[in-house]
């Protein structure tokens, strides 16, 4: 029997095992087809963008490694993304930052317009990919001292307010073009390296700046505003203006989407435990699935306990319709297309695993006080044949099963990536 036949045979056996514990595999696979992951563009070029100034990455962001093949142009980045999407089962999104526009000449960030992203809109339509967006509040002279929307200088603050206003207009145009809301996520690096004398004033300025940016209302069918918190960053170890409490309150009071990044909290703190709590009070949630190693290092997402817990909480709470799943990692030490494939496939595997969990049976045991049975079933289901179901899912949508996708990447690396030369990939 050939490999395809073996995959189907293994799937039939796996389906029987899951049925034995009350799990409808076919229903889970049907739900999987509606799951969209927002794949981040910045993994492909080490967060450099296309503004043309080749400025250093700043404001607490760092990319390490010098693996050859970094995308240097929009065409190269789009080519890399097309390969990555072909290796990932399902229809997914692209998350763009504002510094990735098609700029002909110097265009400052408060001057960007829809026309600078029309090429991306056209490409996304052709690729059947939906777009999400982000203002870029970093790696710019007006962010050199670590402050943007909370800056004490009203002129600098207004520059960044205008950038946010421009980005919302672009996001709305993207959403209108794709007939689906473009999630527009706001993260700013503002904070102090050492203990501040005034924690209140910067937060008041940030709230006022955000209110100014959001003053114009756009239809929810076009764009949704998200706000993202962080505990600390390089250069803002002692104080971050946009803390979790700040943005939680802001999202609740202004009816905005809250963004939780898996790497933006203390290393012993997990966002999986926060999901059911915040979903009681905010309309929708944006997840930045990442992997921090001792700090917000943005390692490639692996199939970790926390990744599984995040997706379990999303599925158990029946939040798939209100939670937007995005990725946020950047690693220049390995093949960048492979990084996309590994991280996105792992995120999807975790969603599938959560959909294959005997959740109702576990809840029944818990309500009846059968905590022994709950633990036993939770542990037993960990070794059920998820891989067989995953391989079937990949094969059913003409995507390489198992590690077969790696050969596609190797070939692309040999034929395409190896022809690129860029010594600046080491940051």
Swiss-Prot record:
Keyword annotations of the record: Cytoplasm, Isomerase, Manganese, Metal-binding, Rhamnose metabolism
Cofactor section: Mn(2+)
GO cellular component, one term: cytoplasm
Matching InterPro entries: L-rhamnose_isomerase, Rhamnose_isomerase, Xyl_isomerase-like_sf
SUPFAM superfamilies named among the record's database cross-references: Xylose isomerase-like
Cofactor: binding details: Binds 1 Mn(2+) ion per subunit.
Function: Catalyzes the interconversion of L-rhamnose and L-rhamnulose.
Signal peptide: none
Keyword Manganese included in the entry's annotation: yes
Similarity annotation: Belongs to the rhamnose isomerase family.
Catalytic activity, reaction form: L-rhamnopyranose = L-rhamnulose
UniProt subcellular location: Cytoplasm
Lineage, top ranks: Bacteria, Pseudomonadati, Planctomycetota, Planctomycetia, Pirellulales
Residues given in the record as Mn(2+) binding sites: 264, 296, 298
The keyword Manganese is annotated on this UniProt entry: yes
Gene Ontology terms, MF aspect: L-rhamnose isomerase activity; manganese ion binding
EC identifiers of the protein: 5.3.1.14
Pfam family, one: RhaA
Protein name as annotated: L-rhamnose isomerase
The protein's annotated pathway: Carbohydrate degradation; L-rhamnose degradation; glycerone phosphate from L-rhamnose: step 1/3
Enzyme class: isomerase
Main location: cytoplasm
């Amino acid at each position: 029997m050939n490999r395809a036949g073996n995959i189907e045979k293994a799937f039939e056996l796996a389906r029987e095992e899951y049925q034995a514990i009350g799990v409808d595999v076919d229903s889970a696979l049907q739900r999987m087809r509606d799951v969209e992951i927002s794949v981040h563009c910045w993994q492909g070029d080490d967060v450099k963008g296309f503004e043309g100034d080749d400025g250093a990455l700043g404001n607490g962001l760092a990319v390490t490694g010098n693996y050859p093949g970094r995308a240097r142009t929009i065409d190269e980045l789009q080519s890399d993304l097309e390969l990555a999407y072909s290796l990932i089962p399902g229809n997914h999104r692209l998350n763009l930052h504002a510094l990735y526009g098609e700029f002909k000449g110097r265009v400052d960030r408060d001057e960007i317009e829809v026309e600078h992203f029309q090429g991306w809109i056209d490409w996304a339509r052709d690729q059947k990919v939906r777009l999400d967006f982000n203002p870029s509040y970093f790696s710019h002279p007006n962010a050199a001292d670590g402050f943007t929307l909370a800056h004490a200088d009203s002129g600098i603050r207004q520059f960044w307010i205008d950038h946010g206003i421009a980005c919302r207009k672009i996001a709305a145009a993207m959403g209108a073009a794709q007939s689906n809301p473009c999630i527009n996520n706001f993260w700013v690096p503002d904070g102090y390296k050492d203990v501040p004398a005034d924690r209140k004033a910067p937060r008041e300025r940030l709230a006022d700046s955000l209110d100014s940016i959001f003053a114009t209302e756009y239809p929810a069918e076009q764009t949704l505003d998200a706000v993202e918190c962080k505990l600390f960053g390089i250069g803002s170890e002692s104080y971050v203006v946009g803390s979790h409490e700040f943005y939680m309150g802001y999202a609740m009071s202004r009816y905005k989407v809250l963004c939780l990044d898996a790497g933006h909290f203390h290393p012993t703190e997990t966002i999986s435990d926060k999901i059911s709590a915040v979903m009681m009070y905010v309309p929708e949630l944006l997840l930045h699935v990442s992997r921090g190693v001792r700090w917000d290092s943005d390692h490639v997402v692996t199939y970790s306990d926390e990744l599984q817990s995040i997706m379990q909480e999303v599925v158990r709470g029946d939040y798939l319709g209100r939670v937007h799943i995005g990725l946020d990692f950047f690693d220049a030490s390995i093949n960048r297309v492979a990084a996309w494939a590994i991280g996105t496939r792992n995120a999807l595997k975790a969603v599938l695993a959560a959909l294959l969990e005997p959740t109702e049976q576990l809840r029944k045991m818990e309500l009846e006080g059968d905590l022994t049975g709950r633990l036993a079933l939770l542990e037993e289901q960990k070794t059920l044949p998820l891989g067989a179901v995953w391989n079937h899912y990949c094969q059913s949508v003409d995507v390489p099963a198992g590690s077969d996708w790696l050969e596609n990447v190797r070939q692309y690396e040999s034929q395409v990536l190896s022809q690129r030369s860029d010594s600046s990939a080491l940051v």
